[in-house]
Design a protein with these regions (language model features):
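Noncatalytic, solvent-exposed loop/strand surfaces
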Residues: 1-406
Length: 406
């Protein structure tokens, strides 16, 4: 069984919860979420992200044999809600990505590109929500933000709204940008009920979302049907959103999301199921049509879905962290680390760290003094953004920087 861990575990009610990145040529047995007793290390449960014949979801694979169901990974950190005792985790694309080679583009291929809500004691899937049937390597494993908020989506900016919402009602929700499409989704935490969703950066893969059911309709113009087809896909396989983390401030009830204005000219390279060919696509990146800046930060209200502010810049944006003092810290692919005003987006401070700020910034206090720490060095996301702005030439040094706050 081949698998690897690309992110750390979490602790949930005395258990170590771990997702994993299924290797492209691994079997379905690698694609699992596991819980181990934190005291003994004994495995408590494991949940498969690819159903076996006869299990719920098996029928969504279009008759594809179990041994040819590959790569529904859970390669980023889950979230845990102690009140409901549920774990929330996101999943990735299948291999190959184009579904015409994998039983048909009309099949769901559960549980790829979904949010899974698991009982922390048993690993049972309590509910799931599929964000998109993915033909392009637009994974959805990123952070799920757990928030209690009033819900009043503004139809002027929020494209898809559940008509049953009572504006102003308080809900315990999961929100954020869970996938590379850059679409914000807000779901009820207990039930998975779809509440609202909206795009951010340019996207052309979703035509609509049914507000009443949450069902996503894929743009048929973006679906591959044969080998050697080339299509403009937005965002590209590096996002939109990617693993660089967003942030949330309860003081402003606002989420802050690092994104890239990127698309790709994706071409199908095979009509066969072969894990050695991985996604079955060539995916050269490009700037989104009409864009000149690669990086952007969206500040979005968790209550209304409105854009509070937006920052754009030539260099790609990487991870963010919000502080209680009204600041959002974040780095970019050109080595700049900066502090934004969390209400206005104004850049209040900036320093050149010399190489891409690829690490996740953290803030902590020692003896009453607050600090912000971050690491630098090359990464896949920084590199893909850098190719869109080749006049910027950061270094490659891997360093740790710690800054004291006033």
């Amino acid at each position: 069984v081949r698998a690897s861990a690309s992110s750390g575990p979490i602790i949930a009610n005395g258990k170590i919860i771990t997702g994993r990145q299924c290797q492209p040529d691994a079997t379905h047995e690698s694609c699992v979420i596991t819980a181990h007793d934190a005291q003994t290390g004994k495995e408590v449960w494991r949940t498969r992200t690819i159903p076996r014949p006869g299990e719920p979801g098996d029928e969504t694979w279009g008759g594809v044999p179990l041994e040819q169901r590959w790569h529904v990974g859970t390669w980023m950190v889950p979230s845990y809600d102690p009140e409901t005792n549920m774990i929330f985790i996101g999943t990735s694309v299948t291999i190959p990505a184009p579904k015409f080679t994998l039983g048909g583009a009309d099949k769901q291929h559960l549980y790829h590109n979904s949010t899974l809500a698991l009982d922390a004691d048993t690993g049972k899937i309590v509910w799931y929500y599929q964000h998109i049937i993915d033909n392009w390597d637009l994974d959805h494993p990123f952070e799920r933000i757990l928030v209690e908020t009033a819900i009043a989506p503004d139809a002027r900016e929020v494209a898809w709204i559940n008509p049953k919402i009572k504006p102003g009602e308080r809900r315990k929700v999961i929100t954020g940008i869970p996938g590379k499409t850059g679409v914000v989704y807000t779901l009820d935490r207990r039930t998975g009920e779809f509440l609202w969703a909206r795009p951010t950066v340019m996207q052309n893969v979703i035509s609509k979302i049914d507000g009443a059911t949450g069902a996503v309709t894929v743009n048929p113009e973006t679906i591959f049907t044969a080998k050697d087809q080339t299509k403009l896909i937005c965002p590209g396989s590096n996002g939109g959103k990617n693993w660089p983390a967003g942030a949330y401030s309860p003081a402003t009830n606002t989420m802050y999301m690092p994104l890239q204005n990127m698309c790709m000219d994706a071409k199908t390279t095979t009509d066969q199921r072969d894990p050695k060919l991985v996604y079955g696509l060539d995916m050269p990146g490009r700037l989104a049509p009409g864009a000149t800046n690669v990086g952007t930060v969206y500040a979005i209200s968790a209550e209304t879905g409105k854009t509070v502010w937006k920052h754009e810049q030539r260099a790609g944006m990487l991870s963010l962290v919000a502080t209680g003092g009204g600041l959002v810290f974040g780095g970019d692919a050109n080595g700049r680390f900066k502090a934004f005003d969390d209400k206005t987006g104004k850049v209040l401070w900036e320093v050149n760290l010399g190489s891409p700020v690829s690490g996740f910034p953290v803030t902590f206090a020692v003896d009453g003094k607050q600090y912000v720490a971050v690491t630098t060095g090359p990464s896949l996301v920084a590199g893909s953004a850098g190719r869109m702005a080749q006049e910027l030439k950061p270094g490659n040094a891997a360093n740790v920087f710690v800054f004291a706050l006033p």
